[in-house]
């Protein structure tokens, strides 16, 4: 007997008992985003590798170590399974000239892929919802995105999260700070861990995000990015804080907050929880005013965020949330050949009336079928025997209430069930 084939490590099946919670989340997301005027954009899972090299940054962990990249043997193109969604969204906006009609509020959802070490809350295939506001320059749109998130947490019953915000300033002010940070860290060159030494000359701001306790001790005395902020970036950040306070959104300023993608500038933010261990960030984003031009479009400001669906569902599970199973309204049982044929008509007629119906399949006597009807969770069993076939009727037996079995015409069954 051959060995069974299993799912790829770090890429998980979503089983029927779990999919109810996914469906609830997805329905909530669509309603929530429509309330703010955001429209859905769907992009391919596979993109040109250069899209991510240009946008995310050539010396980031994602591009250097985590992307699933391959060469198309038909034409030699270098292709990559998307590791994140913002670059694909921006590419589509440029390619289809969407900004010609004015600023755009867009969102996407779907699977992303990174070749990481699988652990709780971190998978090689994971799912994100991303929200992007393109063509908006002011701090008001930054605030809108954060306020949107706060509303979503309420809709999902999530309360154990906190908001951390910061600013990365402009490209120019960040360059000044980068030089000061390198100069400071070089004094501790022998004490830096391997990751920090690698990043020192390529992406030193990412060192600020180190979780290594020894590195945190070194970083405690590091210069602050705030000290090198340009006036416009500082004014932008102060305006954002005013709006958040006016909207009663609590936040913490985290001077060490940086993002793992190179394209961010000015506002950055994360929603964090302590209930998921090391993978505590459930939503993160910020402003990326240079990305559209970087990918080849006409310069335009932009801001957005992405949230990890698996982490949010895990947090909902910690709070006791469960998804609704696809429980039928009615389970159709039948005895005899004529009844089996008539049961098809009954099931389809009830479905036409908007009911969720399971038609018994696989044979079995009446008692066995009724056990399956009860196990299905349905409120009612529709019983069809020879007498029902002759009369063109069905017998309705309540399964969850102490009520009498009744026989009704098929045409009036749905209305009757709605009144019981």
From Swiss-Prot:
Molecular functions per Gene Ontology: ATP binding; histidine-tRNA ligase activity
Matches recorded under SUPFAM superfamilies: Class II aaRS ABD-related (SSF52954), Class II aaRS and biotin synthetases (SSF55681)
UniProt record, GO biological process: histidyl-tRNA aminoacylation
Catalytic activity, EC: 6.1.1.21
Record's catalysed reaction(s): tRNA(His) + L-histidine + ATP = L-histidyl-tRNA(His) + AMP + diphosphate + H(+)
Subcellular location: Cytoplasm
Any Pfam family hit: tRNA-synt_His
GO cellular component, one term: cytoplasm
Enzyme class: ligase
Main localisation: cytoplasm
Keyword annotations: Aminoacyl-tRNA synthetase, ATP-binding, Cytoplasm, Ligase, Nucleotide-binding, Protein biosynthesis
Protein family membership: Belongs to the class-II aminoacyl-tRNA synthetase family.
SUBUNIT field: Homodimer.
Protein name listed in UniProt: Histidine--tRNA ligase
Organism: Nitrosomonas europaea (strain ATCC 19718 / CIP 103999 / KCTC 2705 / NBRC 14298)
Lineage of producing organism: Bacteria, Pseudomonadati, Pseudomonadota, Betaproteobacteria, Nitrosomonadales
Designated gene of the protein: hisS
């Amino acid at each position: 007997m051959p060995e069974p084939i299993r799912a790829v490590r770090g890429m998980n099946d979503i089983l029927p008992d779990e999919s109810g919670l996914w469906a609830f989340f997805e329905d909530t997301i669509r309603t929530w985003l429509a309330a703010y005027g955001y429209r859905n954009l769907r992009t391919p899972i596979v993109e040109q590798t250069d899209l991510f090299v240009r946008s995310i940054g050539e010396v980031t962990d994602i591009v250097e170590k985590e992307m699933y990249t391959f060469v198309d043997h038909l034409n030699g193109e270098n292709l990559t399974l998307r590791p994140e969604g913002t670059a694909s969204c921006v590419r589509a906006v440029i390619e289809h000239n969407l900004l010609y009609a004015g600023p755009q509020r867009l969102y996407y959802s779907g699977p992303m892929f990174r070749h990481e070490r699988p652990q709780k809350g971190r998978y090689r295939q994971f799912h994100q919802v991303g929200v992007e506001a393109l063509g908006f320059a002011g701090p008001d749109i930054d605030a809108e995105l954060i306020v949107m998130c706060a509303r979503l947490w309420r809709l999902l019953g999530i309360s154990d999260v906190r908001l951390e915000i910061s600013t990365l300033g402009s490209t120019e002010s960040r360059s000044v700070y980068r030089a000061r940070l390198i100069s400071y860290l070089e004094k501790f060159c022998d004490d830096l861990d391997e990751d920090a030494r690698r990043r020192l000359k390529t992406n030193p701001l990412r060192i600020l995000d180190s979780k290594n306790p020894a590195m945190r001790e070194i970083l405690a005395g590091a210069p602050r990015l705030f000290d090198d902020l340009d006036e416009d970036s500082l004014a932008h950040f102060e305006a954002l804080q005013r709006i958040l306070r006016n909207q009663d959104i609590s936040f913490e300023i985290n001077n060490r907050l940086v993002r793992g993608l190179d394209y961010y500038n000015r506002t950055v933010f994360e929603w964090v929880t302590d209930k998921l261990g090391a993978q505590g960030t459930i939503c993160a984003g910020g402003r990326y005013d240079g990305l559209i031009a970087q990918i080849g479009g006409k310069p335009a400001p932009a801001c957005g965020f992405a949230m990890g669906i698996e982490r949010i569902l895990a947090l909902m599970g910690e709070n006791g949330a469960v998804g609704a199973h696809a429980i039928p309204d009615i389970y159709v049982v039948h005895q005899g050949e004529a009844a089996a044929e008539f049961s098809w008509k009954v099931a389809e007629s009830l479905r036409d009336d908007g009911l969720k119906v399971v038609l018994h399949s696989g044979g079995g006597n009446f008692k066995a079928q009724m056990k399956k009807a009860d196990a299905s969770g349905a409120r009612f069993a529709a019983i069809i025997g020879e007498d029902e076939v002759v009369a063109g009727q069905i017998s309705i037996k309540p399964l969850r209430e102490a009520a009498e079995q009744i026989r009704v015409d098929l045409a009036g069954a749905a209305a009757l069930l709605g009144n019981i």
